[in-house]
């Protein structure tokens, strides 16, 4: 059986270097390119890569995906900063490259994806729900893509169930005191030295609370999801948003 030819973009970063090691250790994969800042994208096509694992920055991701899709290279994307406008551009590129797949995953940790699913299931059964994400102080975006996605899934579940808005009598507050509002769900971001990536979903009802928490303690926690994404994206054309779609959770 031939091995899946994988390239890593952002290979010199903390997660990227971990991804390089994970691909090299995978028996069914071959690392054909490991590109860092300043390396030319032409190496992707020259290497014969079937899949590119994109772990760069919001400033670079669109150019990288444009190149991949013009050359029929599938992509597994962990870079954040996705807006409706960017997703529309990406879908237009995919329309011009039928058969090519792109997975965008707000989080590659299997545990984090399960946390989102658990919160989505529980949300309609509680009056109140808020999300708290905690990360290292070098993280450039807030709230995290995982927290935003979690809040969106919670809001969808509550809307489908016909849940009433969460009670909140706050009349005055300092800017940001109640967090960011993501589809009606408060999301709070903490940046603290010593942390890596953590999230809590707090749910409350009369006489009880439920906390759903996940902690990533090392970048290695993201590798099983990255490898799963690389294996599945080659047979999943078009855009897939969220690793949960590759986990058969339904």
Curated annotation (Swiss-Prot):
InterPro entries found in the cross-reference section: DapB_C (IPR022663), DapB_N (IPR000846), DapB_N_CS (IPR022664), DHDPR_bac (IPR023940), NAD(P)-bd_dom_sf (IPR036291)
Pathway per the UniProt entry: Amino-acid biosynthesis; L-lysine biosynthesis via DAP pathway; (S)-tetrahydrodipicolinate from L-aspartate: step 4/4
GO molecular-function term, one example from the UniProt record: oxidoreductase activity, acting on CH or CH2 groups, NAD or NADP as acceptor
UniProt-listed Pfam families: DapB_C (PF05173), DapB_N (PF01113)
Sites where the protein binds NAD(+): 10-15, 78-80, 105-108
One of the GO BP terms on file: diaminopimelate biosynthetic process
Catalytic site: 135 (proton donor/acceptor), 139 (proton donor)
Described function: Catalyzes the conversion of 4-hydroxy-tetrahydrodipicolinate (HTPA) to tetrahydrodipicolinate.
Name by which UniProt lists this protein: 4-hydroxy-tetrahydrodipicolinate reductase
Source species taxonomy: Bacteria, Bacillati, Actinomycetota, Actinomycetes, Kitasatosporales
GN (gene name): dapB
